[in-house]
């Protein structure tokens, strides 16, 4: 019978991906809990209010009819409050964000990658804000004063098809501006290329996570350092590594990466201990030599 051998490095890389996914899910759940913190307080009971709360009512010269007015208008005030709560755009937006967070968690549990989910979510949120929170700059002071005295049905919700089309185009432009250069489009091919590059970088770093690399020290000697000593998440290390010149292209071609150069780059930017130990001038020369050697292969 033939036996199937599993590469230990593949197992370590898979465990690292699972750890990153769990940390991302925990972070999203924490953000959802923080956003819903205002819903966890104890409700205020009207029966527990002080008896002299009636003093807060405005006296319009007809104090004798205050009791009748309060009883007769009690139902109307409750109805107005319920309408305000239902029509409050900020409250509706809060519910929308809660649902978006739950949807992100469900998609990640189903196996989808976070970067793809987030790029789609950004466009949806921008479209929601553009449609439901129009720019009020065109309103005059007279319209604002009229709005405070009398309530009129909202007309912003009904828009013509041309307005909807212009709003959707604005949302797409805003999403592209927030995501990167205008020429970059969030196509499936670009996302897959970017994810494959990150996966290749993460795979090679995970394989050599505990391997010691030699660096020049300030005391004219050498010292050993590895990725474990960074005390950083693998996802954060990959993001820093993508800034090293030439690493993204090498990862796209599935070529071997200059891991000592990557480690020196990340450690020099994030580790104070490494900064105190290393000789910066010699490190720059070593990193440049490593890049030239790997790019020429």
UniProtKB/Swiss-Prot annotation:
One of its GO terms (biological process) is symbiont-mediated suppression of host toll-like receptor signaling pathway. InterPro entries: PP_M1-like (IPR004259), PP_M1_C (IPR037199), RABV_P-like_C (IPR049506). The keyword Transmembrane does not apply. The modification Phosphoserine is found at residues 63-64, 162, 210, 271. Keywords: Chaperone, Cytoplasmic inwards viral transport, Host cytoplasm, Host nucleus, Host-virus interaction, Inhibition of host innate immune response by virus, Inhibition of host interferon signaling pathway by virus, Inhibition of host STAT1 by virus, Inhibition of host STAT2 by virus, Inhibition of host TBK1 by virus, Inhibition of host TLR pathway by virus, Interferon antiviral system evasion, Microtubular inwards viral transport, Phosphoprotein, Viral immunoevasion, Viral RNA replication, Virion, Virus entry into host cell. SUPFAM superfamilies: Phosphoprotein M1, C-terminal domain. Pfam families: PP_M1. Residues 71-80, 140-157 have a biased composition (Basic and acidic residues). Residues 138-172 are annotated as: DYNLL1 and DYNLL2 binding. A motif (Nuclear export signal) lies at residues 49-58. One of its GO terms (cellular component) is host cell nucleus. CDD domains: RABV_P-protein-C_like (cd21032). A motif (Nuclear localization signal) lies at residues 211-214. Phosphorylated by host PKC and by an unknown kinase. The keyword Nucleotide-binding does not apply. GO terms for molecular function: RNA-directed RNA polymerase activity. Residues 158-180 have a biased composition (Polar residues). Residues 58-82, 132-189 are annotated as: Disordered. Non catalytic polymerase cofactor and regulatory protein that plays a role in viral transcription and replication. Stabilizes the RNA polymerase L to the N-RNA template and binds the soluble protein N, preventing it from encapsidating non-genomic RNA. Also inhibits host IFN-alpha and IFN-beta signaling by binding and retaining phosphorylated STAT1 in the cytoplasm or by inhibiting the DNA binding of STAT1 in the nucleus. Might be involved, through interaction with host dynein, in intracellular microtubule-dependent virus transport of incoming virus from the synapse toward the cell body. Belongs to the lyssavirus protein P family. This is Phosphoprotein.
């Amino acid at each position: 019978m033939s036996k199937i051998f599993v590469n230990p490095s593949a197992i370590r890389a898979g465990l690292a991906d699972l750890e990153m996914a769990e940390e991302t899910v925990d972070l999203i759940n924490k953000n959802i809990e923080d956003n819903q913190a205002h819903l966890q307080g104890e409700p205020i009971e009207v029966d527990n209010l002080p008896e002299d709360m009636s003093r807060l009512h405005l006296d319009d010269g007809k104090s004798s009819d205050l009791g009748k007015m309060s009883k007769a208008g009690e139902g109307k005030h409750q109805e107005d409050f319920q309408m305000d709560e239902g029509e409050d755009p900020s409250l509706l937006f809060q519910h929308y964000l809660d649902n978006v967070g739950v949807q992100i968690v469900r998609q990640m549990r189903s196996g989808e990658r976070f970067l793809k989910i987030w790029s789609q979510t950004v466009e949806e949120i921008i479209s929601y804000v553009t449609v439901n929170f129009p720019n009020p700059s065109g309103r005059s002071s007279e319209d604002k004063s009229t709005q405070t005295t009398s309530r009129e049905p909202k007309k912003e919700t009904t828009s013509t098809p041309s307005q909807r089309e212009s709003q959707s185009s604005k949302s797409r432009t805003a999403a592209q501006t927030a995501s990167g250069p205008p020429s970059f489009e969030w196509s499936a091919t670009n996302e897959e290329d970017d994810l494959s590059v990150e996966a290749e970088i993460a795979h090679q770093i995970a394989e050599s996570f505990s391997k010691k690399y030699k660096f020049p020290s300030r005391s004219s000697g050498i010292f050993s350092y590895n990725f474990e000593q960074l005390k950083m998440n693998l996802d954060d290390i990959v993001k820093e590594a993508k800034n090293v010149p030439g690493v993204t292209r090498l990862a796209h071609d599935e070529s071997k990466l200059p891991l000592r150069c990557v480690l020196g780059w990340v450690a020099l930017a994030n580790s104070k201990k490494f900064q105190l130990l290393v000789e910066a001038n010699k490190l720059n020369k070593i990193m440049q030599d490593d890049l030239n050697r790997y790019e020429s292969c």
